[in-house]
Regions:
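Bacterial N-terminal signal peptides that target proteins for export
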Residues: 1-7
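Hydrophobic h-region of N-terminal signal peptides that target proteins for export
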Residues: 9-18
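Alpha/propeptide regions of enzymes that mature by internal proteolysis
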Residues: 19-386
């Protein structure tokens, strides 16, 4: 995780959070399915993730100065050093949001270059910065243009979103530090200033590994969650949002806006050999994982999902024709199930990792309380051994 422009105390807090926060399973949340060794999108071989986190200032909002609570997260499907396209598909559950480059994903069936997630008003800057990075790194050898996929959620409750604090150097930093291995969660990258179900949200990840008789494939998910209202929050079937007591009087647990106005971006990666149409089907299943946590994808929510496969190298090789492999539709259902399960867990992991944050005008969003969550998991009759 790359953190820029931080107060020293906040830098220490953010670094410790990324390294030592427990994850949902450690608190007794009984998720379905078998995870990979990292329980992260990087369990899909080749996938690399980088981020830049911007935290500075406090007190009254001064547009252009702060407080700043934002950043950018990037995902390389085949790693930073490998720009070969991958098969991909996307789906919009509710379209009050943005994911650039998806018309070409839909048309071509390919995802080219890194995926980035940031705040709503930084999409253009991040998109242009990715192109500049590709130019600088000599990636335009096969074609003289790029249509990067950049998605967003709104962090304006905690962040000076109209101050445009994400800069080209921040995007380059996230791109240049992307790596395999554990993925930071919570108040990091594009998820720094996000709110989820009235609690602190952010970035989260999880994975599932299919049994050998189902192909042994891996499915990994990364989310940037900024959606839902507190009473909706459901974890492992338990109505957690209704069980947790009100926040202290000096804190705001539920933002002052009404309705389900947040958003969530979900990126699904797999090493299963799937065609673009099948990957669109996989992206649609992320909706069910989201629904498990309580969301109904309200009118003002931007719930947009992308799925890609790292299999089938050389599928776009010139001049062709090219031969590719594909999982039979009759055997694709376990991949659907894995996507649902990993999406649910990634959202909860984001909330468990996130820490209480105070941003513009003293707005405070409380973290999901770990002890209360663990207690409710133990006591709830809905929680069965899995």
């Amino acid at each position: 995780m790359k953190v820029r422009h931080l107060l020293p105390a906040l830098l220490v807090c953010a670094t410790v959070s990324a390294q030592s926060n427990p994850r949902a399973r450690a608190l007794g949340v009984p998720f379905d399915g078998a995870s990979g060794p990292l329980d992260a999108i990087t369990d899909v071989k080749g996938v690399e993730v980088g981020d830049t986190t911007l935290i500075r200032g406090e007190g009254k909002l001064i547009v252009g100065q702060g407080p700043v609570r934002t950043g950018v997260t990037v995902i390389f499907p085949r790693g930073r050093a490998d720009g070969e396209p991958v098969y991909a598909g996307w789906f919009s559950q509710n379209g009050n949001g943005e994911m650039t480059g998806t018309t070409w994903v839909e048309e071509s069936g390919f995802l080219e270059g890194p995926v980035a997630i940031t705040n709503t008003h930084s999409v253009g800057l991040v998109r242009d910065s990715i192109i500049a990075w590709l130019v600088e790194n000599g990636r335009f050898t096969q074609q003289p243009w790029s249509l990067p996929v950049v998605a967003e959620t709104w962090d304006g409750y905690l962040n000076d979103i109209n101050g445009f604090h994400v800069q080209k150097a921040d995007v380059f930093s996230a791109l240049n530090t992307a790596k395999p291995g554990p993925v930071p969660e919570g108040n990091v990258g594009g998820g720094t200033g996000m709110v989820c179900y009235g609690f602190k949200g952010g970035d989260g990840t999880a994975s599932r590994v299919l049994p050998a008789d189902a192909g042994g494939y891996t499915v990994g998910v990364l989310v940037q969650c900024n959606c839902g209202r507190r009473p909706q929050l459901t974890i492992a079937g338990v109505p957690i949002g209704k069980l947790i007591p009100a926040a202290p009087a000096n804190a705001m647990l539920e933002p002052e806006w009404k309705g389900d106005v947040g958003s969530i971006i979900i990126v699904v990666a797999t090493d299963a050999p799937l065609l673009p149409g099948q990957l669109k089907r996989l992206a649609r299943r992320a909706t069910m994982g989201l629904a498990r946590t309580g969301s109904s994808s309200g009118n003002s929510s931007g719930d947009i999902f992308l799925a890609f496969s790292t299999a089938n190298r050389g599928a776009n090789k010139e001049p062709g024709p090219n031969s590719v492999l594909t999982v039979s539709n009759e055997r694709i259902s376990p991949l659907f199930q894995a996507t649902v399960e990993a999406t649910e867990e990634a959202i909860v992991n984001a909330m468990v990792a996130a820490q209480t944050m105070t941003g513009v005008d003293g707005h405070t969003i409380q973290a999901l309380p770990h002890e209360k969550l663990a207690e409710d998991m133990k006591r709830s009759p809905q929680v069965l051994p899995r």
